[in-house]
């Protein structure tokens, strides 16, 4: 099949020509090296080069002063070699392989397109990658002769349409003097509060250009850009419990971040909330009804559903494969749909961090309806086929130095039946009365979470709330509480979702897993859960500092 071709010129001719020369070197060396490797006793049937040109600018401020400014540009080469065939190759999962070959051993490249240096580094990296692939393939052949195969007949690599496309953007430029002034102003807001023991205002501007060629004929160059403005502050209660709060703003360009006056107002509200948390009572162990805000519900789905939908886990013999046999069966209430869509850049005007044009295997990002009317329909797939799914749907992602695996993008939860926030609270009270509870809980904000998917440990999750309120049945004002984590097991948690609100919250952040840290988003309406469990959060025995904090000069 002829490669699909598209070229979009977004840059000056000189800059474009320089980048084209990099692609030319990659293509030339790919063809030269592949011609040799396919004639070896253990032939390589696939070879790919990916270059990631990353420019990162980070500014940090504290107490009205600029703490650090750094700008770094690096180029990384990842070489992917496959020995064997599409049906069986060196990446075949082995029961005893703890990392399933996730490392890629990246090579740092010069920033300038020095053809001789590039060719030398490509040659060295290709030989190293081939030697490792050939060794792994020998282990695969030996292992198959003595072990039961769980995924017999499922190929190790999918055949995909080759594509040629150039859609590059110049690296983002930042007015560092302007943003240094802004960060100093924002961080100075914490100075009058000595009970805030640490704080930070951080701006990260990340601009990435990716170049990918492979022996199937794919030749791609595209850009990914994002900006995070992060606010963090921490205090400590009298009993020693550490109390952090965070506020993060995401945009595709720095000028698209919220106005500084809005950020200033948000910081003042965060400071007041920290003050209230220091005095808030500790919530005892609780099991009962709760509302998850849209942001909290997004993290909830990311942890307990999203990671279990990642396709390679359905083939990994060390994974619990909890959802593998539930395809076509209900796993959520019939009023909920769950979609993953890297092509959607905004939801209700809010930018989404998990957006991209192509994944790291050269497959276009695609909208995936994972759950439809509560029924499991699909998994997130890279080019590792699983039973019933022969092709990638554009979710093979990685950070440089690691092998691409199926990862999340923009997780979107949709509710077919919605009620107003007021009605959702009233339904919470009704559920509390039915269960004989004095109050229910509202999880307003969360820090993040983690989950376990291996067979050797309980398949549980832990979502770490930052802001939790008691909602009383008798109508008393909501009460702020602290000191708990939201825990549970996936299928039970799914079954307890009983209603959804009409609002939508968005969580943007970085997700870490086998293939590294990647930007993702999770968005959802608020959810009413008939029964959740919380456990006490780990607590330090340290008391608040004896010495008063030094006075900080006001910002000028």
Kindly label every feature range from the protein language model.
Residues 377-431:
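C-terminal, non-catalytic macromolecule-binding modules
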Residues 367-368, 377-378, 409-410, 439-440, ...:
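Conserved active-site beta-strand-loop modules that form the wall/rim of enzyme catalytic pockets
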Residues 2-10:
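Sec-dependent signal peptide recognition
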Residues 245-247, 381, 482-483:
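Short clusters of small/polar residues that mark proteolytic maturation junctions
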Residues 11, 15-358, 363-367, 372-375, ...:
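Active-site bordering "gate/hinge" segments
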Residues 414-492, 508-514:
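Hydrophobic alpha-helical bundle architecture
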Residues 285, 363-365, 404-408, 436-438, ...:
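Short gly/pro-enriched beta-turn/loop segments at secondary-structure junctions
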């Amino acid at each position: 099949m002829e490669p699909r071709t598209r070229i979009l010129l977004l840059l000056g001719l000189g800059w474009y020509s320089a980048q084209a020369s990099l692609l030319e070197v990659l293509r030339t060396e790919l063809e030269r090296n592949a011609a040799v490797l396919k004639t070896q006793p253990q032939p390589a049937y696939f070879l790919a080069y990916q270059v990631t040109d990353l420019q990162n600018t980070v500014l940090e401020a504290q107490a009205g002063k600029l703490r650090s400014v750094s700008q770094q540009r690096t180029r990384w080469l990842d070489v992917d070699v496959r020995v064997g065939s599409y049906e069986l190759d060196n990446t075949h999962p082995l029961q005893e392989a703890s990392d399933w070959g996730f490392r890629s051993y990246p090579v740092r490249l010069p920033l300038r397109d020095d053809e001789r240096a590039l060719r030398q580094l490509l040659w060295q990296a290709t030989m190293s990658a081939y030697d490792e692939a050939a060794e792994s393939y020998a282990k695969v052949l030996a292992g198959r002769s003595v072990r039961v195969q769980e995924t017999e007949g499922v190929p190790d690599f999918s055949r995909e349409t080759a594509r040629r496309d150039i859609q590059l953007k110049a690296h983002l430029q930042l007015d560092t003097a302007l943003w240094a002034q802004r960060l100093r102003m924002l961080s100075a807001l914490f100075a009058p509060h000595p009970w805030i023991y640490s704080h930070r205002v951080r701006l990260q501007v990340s601009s990435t250009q990716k170049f990918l060629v492979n022996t199937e004929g794919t030749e791609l160059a595209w850009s990914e850009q994002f900006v995070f403005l992060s606010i963090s502050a921490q205090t400590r209660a009298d009993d020693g419990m550490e109390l952090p709060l965070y506020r993060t703003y995401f945009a595709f360009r720095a000028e698209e971040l919220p106005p500084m006056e809005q950020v200033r107002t948000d910081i003042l509200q965060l400071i007041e909330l920290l003050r209230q948390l220091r005095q808030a009572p500790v919530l005892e162990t609780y099991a009962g009804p709760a509302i998850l805000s849209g942001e909290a519900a997004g993290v909830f789905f990311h942890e307990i559903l999203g990671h279990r939908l990642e396709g390679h886990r359905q083939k990994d013999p060390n994974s619990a494969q909890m959802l593998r046999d539930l395809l076509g069966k209900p796993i959520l209430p019939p009023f909920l749909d769950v979609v993953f869509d890297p092509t959607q850049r905004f939801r209700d005007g809010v930018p989404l961090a998990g957006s991209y044009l192509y994944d790291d295997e050269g497959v276009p990002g695609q909208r995936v309806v994972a759950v439809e009317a509560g029924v499991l329909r699909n998994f997130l797939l890279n080019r590792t086929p699983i039973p019933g799914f022969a092709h990638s749907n554009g979710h093979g992602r990685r950070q440089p130095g690691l092998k691409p695996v199926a990862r999340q993008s923009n997780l979107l939860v949709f509710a077919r039946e919605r009620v107003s926030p007021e009605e959702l609270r009233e339904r919470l009270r009704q559920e509390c009365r039915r269960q004989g509870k004095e109050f229910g809980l509202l999880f307003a904000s969360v820090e993040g979470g983690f989950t376990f998917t291996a067979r050797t440990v309980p398949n549980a999750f832990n979502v770490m709330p930052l802001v939790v309120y008691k909602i009383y049945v008798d109508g008393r004002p909501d009460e702020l509480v602290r000191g708990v984590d939201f825990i549970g097991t996936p299928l039970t948690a799914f079954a307890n979702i009983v209603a959804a609100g009409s609002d939508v919250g968005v969580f943007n952040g970085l997700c870490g897993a086998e293939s590294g840290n990647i930007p993702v988003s999770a968005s959802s309406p608020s959810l009413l859960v008939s029964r959740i469990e919380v456990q006490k959060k780990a607590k330090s025995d340290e008391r608040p500092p004896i010495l008063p904090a030094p006075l900080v000069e006001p910002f000028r």
